[in-house]
Design a protein with these regions (language model features):
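Helix-to-loop junction immediately C-terminal to a conserved catalytic motif
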Residues: 48
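H-loop/switch region of ABC-family ATPase nucleotide-binding domains
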Residues: 183-184
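H-loop (His-switch) and adjacent beta-strand-loop-beta switch element
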Residues: 194-210
Length: 222
């Protein structure tokens, strides 16, 4: 469960919304939608504990440490950093106790699962946008966090990559994890995500995604 009470976020002295209250049930799958500049990505950072709210609080039903995984937008990653794809993905083992053999087997399985086999030693700068995004998603897959925050996870993915992404999102949801997904593709939200949180400068609305999208036919999201 993610409960936000009296929450305001944004730059100091410049809140993006008035104080809002909403609760995302444990095991729910929710899209965050809204126009450019309404603070969708910032909201995920506040929930993740990476950005302080201007007011209010976020309460989780599990300890934050080790219980939450956050997928940021890939433009925040330094692609000049001298590591390989395999090393990037293996960073997802942080805090997980496994034997070297267990790690090796799990890493190999995850790389194959995200169609990254054969790219293990490729440096970040040599990866395509889609390959890098799948690597970041593979890193996320190594953890078993009950709460997953995904900021535009479909970015840079081709049609095959997006199908793979939604397959995993549905699998994580079926496992009972709580997922919050920033997504600008309303057609994908309507098809794959049952609930949506619409953010406007006037506040937030939480409702079934089909209902919200139908009521907001001209909503531009990104």
């Amino acid at each position: 469960m993610i409960r936000c009470q009296g929450l305001r976020w944004g730059a100091p002295g410049q809140p993006l919304t008035p104080a809002v209250d909403f609760e995302l049930a444990a095991g729910s799958l929710t899209a965050v939608i809204g126009a450019n500049g309404t603070g969708k990505s910032s909201l995920l950072k506040v929930i993740a504990g990476l950005q302080k709210p201007l007011a209010g609080k976020v309460t989780l039903d599990v300890p934050r440490r080790g219980s939450l995984s956050f997928l940021p937008q890939q433009q925040h990653l330094d692609r000049q950093f001298p590591i390989s794809l395999q090393e990037l993905v293996a960073a997802g083992f942080w805090g997980i106790k496994q034997t070297p053999q267990q790690r090796s087997e799990r890493l190999r399985a995850v790389l194959e699962d995200w169609h990254l086999g054969g790219l293990e030693q490729r440096p970040l700068m040599a990866l395509s946008g889609g390959e890098l995004q799948r690597a970041l998603l593979a890193r996320l897959s190594l953890a078993s966090a009950p709460i997953l925050l995904l900021d535009e996870p479909h970015a840079a993915l081709d049609e095959e990559g997006q199908a793979l992404l939604w397959k995993h999102i549905h699998a994580w949801h079926a496992e009972g994890r709580t997922l919050v997904v920033v997504c600008h593709d309303l057609a994908a939200v309507r098809q794959h995500i049952p609930n949506a949180l619409l953010i406007k400068n006037s506040g937030c609305t939480l409702a079934p995604s089909t209902q919200l999208i139908q009521q907001q036919p001209n909503t531009q999201v990104a």
